[in-house]
Amino acid sequence: MKKRTRILSLLLAVVLSASALVGCENDTKTNGEVKEQKKQNVKAEIPATEYDLVSAGSSKYFILIPENPTEYESYAAEELQLFLKEATGAELAISKENEADTGGSFLSVGNTKASQDAGVAPSYEEVKSNGFVLKTVDDDCYLKGFSDIGTRNSVYEWLSYAVDWEIYASDEIVYTETKDLKLLAFDQTVVPSIEWRANNGPSVYNEELTYRMRKNLFEEVYLHGRLVHNSMTIVDPTVYNFESDEYKDWYSEKIVGDRPAQLCYSNEEMREVYIENLLKQLEGAKANVVILGMEDNVEWCSCEKCAASKEKYGTDAAVMIKFANKVQEAVNEWNKVNRVGQTPIKCVFFAYYATVEPPVTYNKETDKYEPIDESVILQEDLGVMFAPILASYSQSFTTEMNADVERQLLGWNALTDNIHAWTYAFHTAQNLIFKNTFEIMQENYQLLIDNGTSALYDQTNGAQKVPDTGWASAQFYVQSKLMWDSSLNVKELLDDFFDHYFDTASGTMKEIFNEERSWMSHIYNDLGALGRIGDNLLRAEYWSYPYLKQALSQFEKAYGEIEVYRESDPERYKQLYERITLETIQYRYILISLYGTNYTDAELLNMKYAFKKDAELLGLNVYAEGVSIGVLWDEWGIK
């Protein structure tokens, strides 16, 4: 695995259980113990063994990996080596099994022969693709998943107990430094609440952050990565000319841009070519899921067959289900020949716009949804990507406003227990304005989990190449934590994040954040905003001038609170200064856009150029979905 520059921050305040740390004689141990007793997010206590993993900053242990390690097994071992050295000063050698003395003491990472001999062999049924086992046997310890992705995740869990390791952002990683460390008596099986967990935003451009947050790259889950609306790449209308008599019936009559809006999923000839082309793309696939992706628009085919299906089932989804069942049947046959000894490839299709409604009926007697007929039940290996793009994300899916969303989810769960979910946590029209999903995130995640969701993609602003304004770093952290363990206390997660990420300015920044959460609730509950991703929130009736000015004055207080670092730690000061400045961006954007007339021409021009300078310094590159921030400079009349 190619290594990237790592920016580390030493622990500012230890808040985790003292049982996870042995041999660190300082006040933070006691303080951490007291604080932990008051918290809900408490880790299990793991007793120490008699064995010294590190003593006086040195170790007799080494890290054992398989003779032929996978990329992720090697990466996991390197991460373990790195952070143990950072925390203790001891650099454990990494040794392949064919080169190592397995009679010595070791930390085994991945599918080693030693782990098999020790009986550490987690099955898929036990830990799925992302879970793992941590097991101490005598003076050795085994870190192992069913997959190497699970093994990668196991290292961060192990570190969290051994040295209180935690990551809040790519440049905010904390741990407790100690020169003496006992080996802990691990006997844990860890399975995430959601098997596959993904976002975009920072994780698009920083693989290392994704791994350390125990998230998944899209490419780890889905064959085509982020190319999810991919039907026209499988049956290309320029190759199979949609204007010709031979192929025109393969596509919908409606045109979007310069090509058909959708494929005609009831056309059997098209389906055979689709299957033939798709199977070619499966060769050598690393991911185990392929998305049968409709195009990204609201249109659907209205040919006689498709229209008749909609008339019968009340939704266009029935045509898609029958098409996808046939594709999955063909993929299953292909798996038997081409995926022997490997995880079989499964398909998912979109429940999105025209296909979001499941073909089900409601049985009042049983209080459950049922398929209209057996032909619309998804076969075992087929799944659905439930993407409620028209939902309100200001309220949970269980509220009256989102009654249709909950009904749709329950309906799909009546057809399959293999649901992948795509939810939305950003504004398409104004990327720079806070999208507050903190109030509903946990409840929505739990509802999805309770109804068969095994994969979740909670979409944020994927085009922004750096952490976004509008509290996006806090959002990314909490999303990561709740996807892994949906039972965690959100307030404690936020308190922990702010205390580390904003350091001495934590209290003020948290106050600004919570005030904006309340203000956003006012916008949604009292002023009529729907909470949808396409909302236009850049309206004067939503934002009062006094509120914006008050928030900006609070940021000045936060800048003052980090002055303690200006001379003593200039690098930390710069880091905190930029983090605070990033959060000012959305307020300044709204103020300039809506209340520019409150200032003289000269004052407004200076405000715009100061904004531009900070935005460029921070690396912000877009301000709306698909719209470069350079367009904003043009609109503002600045260069």
Predicted regions: what they are:
Residues K481-K639:
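Catalytic domains of carbohydrate-active enzymes that cleave complex glycans
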Residues C347-P388, L432-T437, P467-Q475:
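Substrate-binding cleft/loops of secretory-pathway carbohydrate-active enzymes
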Residues N68-E71, A76-E79, F83, Y124-G314, ...:
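Feature activates predominantly on carbohydrate-active enzymes
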Residues M1-L11:
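Bacterial N-terminal signal peptides that target proteins for export
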Residues E25-V133, K179-D187:
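Acidic, contiguous N-terminal accessory segments
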Residues S19-G23:
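C-terminal motif of bacterial Sec signal peptides marking the signal peptidase cleavage site
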Residues A324-T361, I419-F426, L456-Q459:
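Aromatic-lined carbohydrate-recognition surfaces of secreted/lumenal glycan-active proteins
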Residues Q262-E272, K280, E400-G507, E511, ...:
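Structured mid-domain segments that build the active-site/substrate or prosthetic-cofactor binding neighborhood
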